[in-house]
């Protein structure tokens, strides 16, 4: 059997990283981590509180520390769902590229808005115009997600199980390709 590396999911808010991550970790028999939950557990506080007290920069520093800690301690043995802004720091992009098979779960701005419309735990969306915020974030982050991604999977209008199966199939194809190419 082919041993898969760490599988790290990146993408915007509402792409389904946590839901899909749980499903594929169960199928692959790997440990699952939600990076935001790890950060909250380490800080003893929730993300909105961290943003309020330390600002986005303080949160991003915690995010880098948590990411590095997970990939170093469980090399080849986990599925990790990241926060939407993981790609904003070059250091994080380097860690992602060097330590994992990175899956970009693509979601359009319209889909992101639909999926996040009822959420109160997304500090960056606590604005008068969430659509404009999501559009701006997408324009900045989409090229960065693509830069670190090994695989890109579209999630718009798809059921989580369907997306998870698509991710698993793409991972299998990718790993077979890696083995046959020498």
From Swiss-Prot:
Binds 1 Mg(2+) ion per subunit. The keyword Ribosomal protein does not apply. One of its GO terms (cellular component) is cytosol. It is an enzyme of class 2 (transferase). Pathway: Metabolic intermediate biosynthesis; chorismate biosynthesis; chorismate from D-erythrose 4-phosphate and phosphoenolpyruvate: step 5/7. SUPFAM superfamilies: P-loop containing nucleoside triphosphate hydrolases. Keywords: Amino-acid biosynthesis, Aromatic amino acid biosynthesis, ATP-binding, Cytoplasm, Kinase, Magnesium, Metal-binding, Nucleotide-binding, Transferase. Substrate binds at residues 36, 60, 84, 141. Monomer. This is Shikimate kinase. The gene is aroK.
């Amino acid at each position: 059997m082919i041993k898969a590396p760490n599988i790290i999911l990146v993408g915007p808010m509402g792409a389904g990283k946590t839901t899909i991550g749980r499903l594929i970790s169960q199928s692959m028999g790997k440990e699952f981590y939600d990076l935001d939950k790890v950060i909250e557990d380490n800080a003893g506080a929730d993300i909105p509180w961290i943003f309020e007290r330390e600002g986005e920069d303080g949160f991003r520093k915690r995010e880098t520390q948590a990411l590095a800690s997970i990939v170093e301690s469980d090399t080849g043995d986990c599925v990790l769902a990241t926060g939407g802004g993981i790609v904003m720091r070059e250091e994080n992009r380097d860690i992602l590229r060097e330590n994992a098979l990175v899956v970009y779960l693509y979601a359009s701005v319209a889909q992101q808005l639909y999926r996040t419309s009822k959420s109160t735990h997304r500090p960056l969306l606590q604005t008068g115009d969430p659509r404009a915020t999501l559009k701006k974030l997408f324009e900045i982050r989409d090229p960065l997600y693509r830069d670190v991604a090994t695989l890109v999977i579209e999630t718009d209008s798809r059921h989580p199980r369907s997306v998870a199966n698509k991710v698993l199939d793409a991972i299998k194809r990718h790993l077979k390709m890696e083995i046959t190419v020498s």
